[in-house]
Amino acid sequence: DVYKRQGLAFALIALAYTFFARQEWSSTAITDRPTVNMLGGYYSQQQFLRNLDVRSNMASADQPSVMDEAYKEFVMQLASWDTRREFWLQTDYYKQRMVGNSKADAALLDEMINNIQFIPGDFTRAVNDSVKLIAETAPDANNLLRQYVAFASQRAASHLNDELKGAWAARTIQMKAQVKRQEEVAKAIYDRRMNSIEQALKIAEQHNISRSATDVPAEELPDSEMFLLGRPMLQARLENLQAVGPAFDLDYDQNRAMLNTLNVGPTLDPRFQTYRYLRTPEEPVKRDSPRRAFLMIMWGIVGGLIGAGVALTRRCSK
């Protein structure tokens, strides 16, 4: 009877403890890389830069997709200590629990940071990335986890936009240099051609060559014999060249079009989504701690064992 009473007493104490102990509820989310539509304008602009790299042979063969790179940045933010810290600092959940003591508040913040747990996936076992958040109530666990995932995604989008701006500026500088180089080459060829025709025209005038004195096609004549075409033809070629100006190829026209697009600059969307849910956070139906039935059974057994020990000691003393 003693061990039964002891067991019942300990079980009741455990039951009372569960009513006053701080509760812990957890909600879990499972994520994967986003779709093209979720990335919005970021995808098309990043792909535009990649196409420029392909044209200039700067792209690597094993380059990950835009979706993979965006999701990689999201996962980095999701697991980041700084992201978790910044998230809690801006929540009412943390502010309402501050006591005004710097050490106590810092300890509370550390505890909350550890209450967000990122579990990396294992693709060899087809396990996706997941994140769990522990809070004092079921609604808080659900709502805070949704907010945290969105917060991490927004930070990832901000970092990706910064990288896009930097890459865009670098490509603009490269394209300007390339276009300028092509213009200088075309101008040098034009000036050399103009000079050749002008010199040939002077010689033709000096020798009074008024008509063509050769059967060789004009395109096959070396510059030193161009005067044989005669003054009228050379004058016409000179005027035509002056009217047309430097000649540019298709590659130059394409580069000019690309440069015009680059000069406009990227259009940044600060809130594009860098993930998609495979398991959306929900309100948990069972709390993590304290587990009432488990504690009552465990402490009931402990109480029973203590009661049995007390009864055995009394018998031995008699």
Q: What does each model-found stretch correspond to?
A:
Residues V310-K318:
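C-terminal membrane-anchoring or membrane-association module
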Residues Q23-S27, V127-V131, Q273-T274:
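Envelope-exposed proteins and targeting segments
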Residues Q6-A11, L15, G300-G304:
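Alpha-helical transmembrane spans of integral membrane proteins, capturing the lipid-embedded, hydrophobic core
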Residues V75-N263:
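Soluble oligomerization/assembly scaffold segments of membrane-associated complexes
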Residues T18-Y71, V75, R193, I197-A213, ...:
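Short, glycine-rich, amphipathic interfacial segments at transmembrane boundaries or analogous
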Residues V2-Y3:
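Short, small-residue-biased leader/transition segments that mark boundaries at the very start
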Residues A257-G304:
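Interfacial amphipathic helix/helix-coil modules
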